[in-house]
Every structure is written in C-alpha cells, then in structure tokens.
Amino acid sequence: MPALPIDQEFDCERFRADIRATAAAIGAPIAHRLTDTVLEAFRDNFAQGATLWKTTSQPGDQLSYRFFSRLKMDTVSRAIDAGLLDAAHPTLAVVDAWSSLYGGAPVQSGDFDAGRGMAKTWLYFGGLRPAEDILTVPALPASVQARLKDFLALGLAHVRFAAVDWRHHSANVYFRGKGPLDTVQFARIHALSGSTPPAAHVVEEVLAYMPEDYCVAITLDLHSGDIERVCFYALKVPKNALPRIPTRIARFLEVAPSHDVEECNVIGWSFGRSGDYVKAERSYTGNMAEILAGWNCFFHGEEGRDHDLRALHQHTESTMGGAR
C-alpha cells in the first residue's frame, strides 16, 4: 500500500482521544489500560492495516474496534502473550484449524471492545471457499458440523470469512449467497434464527440494500451448534444514502471520526431469539475500502455479481443434473 498522508495514518495518541470521545458520546464503557495493552500488542497491525469502529443499536453496548490486517501474523498467540486471551481457551483449536486451511492462507484480524479488550479473531479465507471445508474441520463438535446440511439446503455453499467470539464461545460464518435475495429466500434464512419474522417494511429495506450476490453471517454456538443469529450486511453506504437507522446508530455515525482516504460505513441487520438490532461499522484509518475491495467485497450501488460464485453454482447444478 502506498504511504498515506500523515493525517490518515494510525496515531496511537489520537486514537486514545478519539475512543474516549466516541465512547462518551454513545454511552459505552471504556477501560483505558486495556486499550493501551491492545495498542502495544498490535502496534504493527494498526499501523499497517485498516482500523474501523463498530457498535450496535443496543443501549449501552460496547464501542468496538477492529484492524483488518495486511500482515500475515498469528494474532492469537500475540493476544495470549499480551494477557488479552486465555491460553487454555476451549475454542483455540477452532481458530488453529481454520488458520491452517489452504496451506495456511487465511489472514487473521482482531476485534476489540473498548471496555473489555479482546473480543473476536476474524479470518479471511482468501476467497470463496466450500462451506464443507470450513464447517467440517475436526476441531468443531459434531453438533456444529451437522449444521452444514441446513446451509447447503438454502444454497449457502460458500464461505469467505469467519470470526470466533472468545467471550460468547460462538462463531460468525460469513456466506456469500447467489442472489438476488428475495422475500422467500430472506424468510428461509431468517427462520434459522428462530426469531419472530420482522415487519414487511424492514424486510423491504434489507432487500433494497443487498448487492445481487449478498453477504449473510450466521452465528453458531460452538458447543451446542445452535444458530443464535443471522445478519445481512450492506457495505460502504454513503451518509446521504443510509437506511432508517436507530438513534444510537445515527449518533455513532455522526460522532465516530474517520480519518480515512474514503469514508466507509457498514450497516448490518441482525436477527435472533434474544432480539433484533442494527449494527454499524465506520472506517477510521488505513483505507478500509481498499482492503474490502481487494477481498472482492461488494459496495452499495454496485451490481455485486460474483461471477466465480455463479460459475460454481452452474457447475454444481450441471453435475447434479447429469447424476439424475
């Protein structure tokens, strides 16, 4: 990546001031010593990656931040060495297994809560990957592996990202679905969450913001295999084109500073038995849009058609047709 202008680089002191002000503005907790530990442990990742803010519409929820890494690094070991993660955590084996796939190609990034420290380890698998590869690693219990058939039945056969939530012992698995997403497919995917179907106007809005081939994240309990949530994402939504958003999200997008080359706002509609809410992310430094574009993510206003995905679907359909 070319050198960024000085005002767009990650600066630890400026970040400390910005995180204090943003947390105060949205009523989120903050632990300053934990923040210092994170910044020291992952200094290179913040300096060379892209940093973003995150929160949800839930009152008092955490102000979170993430680096999308440009460095190939074992961030889990670094978190353990810094005292941010327990070396005996029961889900370490899952991250190890996923990180070793495809000759060790997956890239690890880190999510942190301002008030609690290490939150998630995020993995980009290097492109479209068969869901079978991701969801049948031996480190996953049979209850989780058994979910594969449910996803394949919905046409969710390819995964691009996953994130392990250390605190909740769960994982978000990010599928790219062949679209366009319609009300029938939305309802089928939403039913996995077990939550009450949303109002028609909510569904209409979600569909209006989805690219043709869409991203849906499914949250799995890593012990029971229960599906806890489903979330649909819209990326790089300009402020003048935002959907209807809750007051807390509007406040967050107003006050969270972005020193990035391009402003990149992400909206997620999350549905689950414990309640529905809206997520938001906002670029901070490091050219978040460049990283996401390099990972073939689709932005608001783009056609969003994944030709590789469609070729894979066509091959699968022709193979199944020939087997009849």
From Swiss-Prot:
MF GO annotations: prenyltransferase activity; transferase activity, transferring alkyl or aryl (other than methyl) groups
Keyword Nucleus found: no
Catalysed reaction equations from the record: 3-(4-hydroxyphenyl)pyruvate + dimethylallyl diphosphate = 3-dimethylallyl-4-hydroxyphenylpyruvate + diphosphate
Lineage: Bacteria, Bacillati, Actinomycetota, Actinomycetes, Kitasatosporales
Keyword Transferase applies: yes
Subunit structure, as described in the record: Monomer.
EC number: 2.5.1.111
Top-level lineage group: Bacteria
Keyword terms, alphabetized: Antibiotic biosynthesis, Prenyltransferase, Transferase
Binding site for substrate: R160, E281
SUPFAM superfamilies cross-referenced by the UniProt entry: Prenyltransferase-like
The protein's annotated pathway: Antibiotic biosynthesis
Annotated family: Belongs to the aromatic prenyltransferase family.
Listed name of the protein: 4-hydroxyphenylpyruvate 3-dimethylallyltransferase
Gene deletion effect: Cells lacking this gene produce antibiotic compounds (vanillobiocin, isovanillobiocin and declovanillobiocin) with a methoxy instead of the dimethylallyl group at the position 3 of the 4-hydroxybenzoic acid moiety of clorobiocin.
Function per UniProt: Magnesium-independent aromatic prenyltransferase that catalyzes the irreversible transfer of a dimethylallyl group to 4-hydroxyphenylpyruvate to produce the ring A structure in the clorobiocin biosynthesis pathway. Clorobiocin is an aminocoumarin family antibiotic.
Main EC class the enzyme belongs to: transferase
GO terms of biological process kind: antibiotic biosynthetic process
Gene that encodes it: cloQ
